[in-house]
Amino acid sequence: IEKQDHWNDHFAAAMKKAYEAHPRDIEIATIYAEAILNQTPWKMWDIWKNKVAEGAGTVKAQRVLERFVDTPEGRVHPGILHLYVHLMEMSPTPEKALMAGDRLRELVPHAGHLIHMPTHIDSQCGEYRDALHWNQKGIAADLKIAERQGRMNFYTAYRVHNYHFAIYGAMFLGQYEPAISAAEEMIREIPVELLKLESPPMADFLESYISMKTHVQIR
């Protein structure tokens, strides 16, 4: 990722010019906001000090997204809603993205990742029932992709993440059965052959998930 930093910075600078030239274009705004987030991925906020992380373009991205997120066009735009959830999930105020998440979760019904994504906010706000329910929905949607394209691909990492969140939500609800069921299904969805792939190094991404069944049994 570090090797791509200069490319990310150059792209964000180019998108800034495009956005300034076309400030009302929601597609340009979406790509510009994403470009800002990609400059410091998962480092938009200092979670220990409850403030914007030093050197991050958090405020810029927030201004762009909040300009559109509650407009008629923005309320039905998967890109704007998705990025706003990503931006706010580690913020001191994740609840600000609850409405965006609610709009996103049924907007693209065959995209399991977008069904899942609002549960990042649900989990931060204690909405564990929604976290379990909507990840089960995301799992079902993504199984159609697995049946069509197989499991020997990087998207399996996204699908496994749905099981991960279903387990998390179920454990916080004190519900053993859905938690252990999700853990066992998740293991079945990770072929040994996939873990053996070296490029990309899929074991680095996926192997730790297999231990979650033990986590459920202990908790």
Regions found by a protein language model. Give the residues of each.
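Structural helix-adjacent loops and short alpha-helical linkers that scaffold large soluble proteins
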Residues: 4, 73-74, 93-95, 127-130, ...
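Alpha-helical positions within canonical tetratricopeptide repeat
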Residues: 10, 27, 60, 96-99, ...
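Alpha-helix capping and inter-helical loop/turn segments
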Residues: 41, 92-95, 218-219
